[in-house]
């Protein structure tokens, strides 16, 4: 609904007039394998604008652990971890005050995961993420929205461990199937987390 990909069954969704959304799904978009990093991430431009400030593309890519020698490398020659960092660099190169991330830790190496945590902790905006990575949520979120199979949403302050310490518990898939009437389809119970600030 926030992304405008679905329409509400009832009522309406109002978004702020200055809302700028950046979205990354589990598939994370595709990079052009024949193009180099600067072409893929910065549109081939030597400079990019981030939060009203002009940055050199090589300096910006350095924030994502790329050496100046690697920025002209075709994407097809990059490792999987480097490609994931390139996708993150492209995502964060776009102006945004709301990030929507769907399973952002899938297939990330430790170095890239730590980089993502640092970026999210310093992000000046709101982050809505869907994740089953409990450790990651403990590091980056300040609030949880637990989506239940019956359509209810439970809101809790803190990360996953905080919720668990207060007695929170996810129903395991086998248990959930046994508890549901046969006429209802099984619905997964993803955990959605939202950091500090609100849009």
For every predicted segment, state its role.
Residues 1-199:
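ABC ATP-binding cassette signature C-motif
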